[in-house]
């Protein structure tokens, strides 16, 4: 999924072709016993059979491999390597090669959190490398990009992009001790507050424009947490780390509005006692 510029691609297509050239959803990742036997040979496939549970996902009896029971890790890892090599000869799904700021920022945040919890320091280093690539490719003075495609700039960033960059960079600063990431987070968050603040104290999805008769104003979670939820989390984290009382107060102001977002309400609760909204 990693692109040449260090960012991560948006996704892979669900569909790809089978050996006969017919298109199926998920076919690239699925197996049955015959395919396993073709890849491993009869003896090894029979050894593996009781150790993997094949749950059919379609009418062809194909499914994903799910380990069960006690296994010999050295042997089964060798088998998995062989199956992975066999899968690599299949027709791979197409890759959407645009890079999206918010998704890359969420990946940074996830790598940092998982790396710290599981003590996988290489994940924190991967997060640092990704953050460096994201800052280089998608930030220009005070303006961020939402997308790029093969290093060509796309549309301007929206609120969730700014919020997650600030949130993830602050987390990276805490994990690495490198203050430059907190400086970047403060810069990005300041721009976000200036660009996306709504009159009711919450945050707009995108900047006001003469092209828009109504500016979107989302408080509910969808594929990503709502922009207001992300901004509250970012303002709180960056405000505490950078000792910016104005950011914390802005988070408090935004917290008075959300009504139906799980992440928004979770963000409010992080503000502490006495900060919950009253309806």
Question: Residue locations for each model-derived region?
Answer:
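Glycan-recognition and catalytic cores of secretory/periplasmic carbohydrate-active enzymes
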Residues: 1-279
